[in-house]
Amino acid sequence: MGKYFDELERAMQWLGQQPDTMFLGQAVEYKGTAMTNTLVNVPRQKLLEMPVNEEMQMGITNGIAVAGTVPISLFPRWNFLLCAVNQLVNHLDRLKAYS
């Protein structure tokens, strides 16, 4: 493909080799987006396929991070990412107060 894609694929492979990472999102386990092709060499047990629900995905991403794993959350439909902002603004930033 191109240099950008090659570097993105190389970065995803490196992240996939790290013991504390996890990939989640739409089309991470199954073909569907260009990002799927960057995950071909990532171990399958590190991939968590998500339904189309950006806010839920961000909430799960926050929980995974709080539990100590490094989440790599893929949002192929970036124009719907604004739906996930609630989880960041109204939940993650108040985590200390809730704990």
What residues fall within each predicted segment?
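Thiamine diphosphate
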Residues: 1-99
